[in-house]
Amino acid sequence: MNDVFSTAQHKLDALGLRCPEPVMMVRKTVRQMAQGETLLIIADDPATTRDIPSFCEFMDHTLIASETMQTPYQYLIKKGL
């Protein structure tokens, strides 16, 4: 695991879930987090490579890092406002 991903304050395992479940779980988890906290998302649905970055942009969260060259995919996001 890359060092940047190990800094996450929260972790969400979305392995085995298919669209739209991963993004719905991310949204629910982020709602319970404080502004500025980070979330590591681990997923294997190819749709997350498009959906997670779009979710972050739409909801004003920051996509700090992503690893999508191999599964499981990893995303590190920081909660915005």
Swiss-Prot record:
Keywords: Cytoplasm. The keyword Plastid does not apply. The active site is at 19 (cysteine persulfide intermediate). It comes from the Bacteria. GO terms for biological process: tRNA wobble position uridine thiolation. CDD domains: SirA. GO terms for cellular component: cytoplasm. It is found in: Cytoplasm. One of its GO terms (molecular function) is sulfur carrier activity. Belongs to the sulfur carrier protein TusA family. Sulfur carrier protein which probably makes part of a sulfur-relay system. This is Sulfur carrier protein TusA. It comes from Shewanella oneidensis (strain ATCC 700550 / JCM 31522 / CIP 106686 / LMG 19005 / NCIMB 14063 / MR-1).
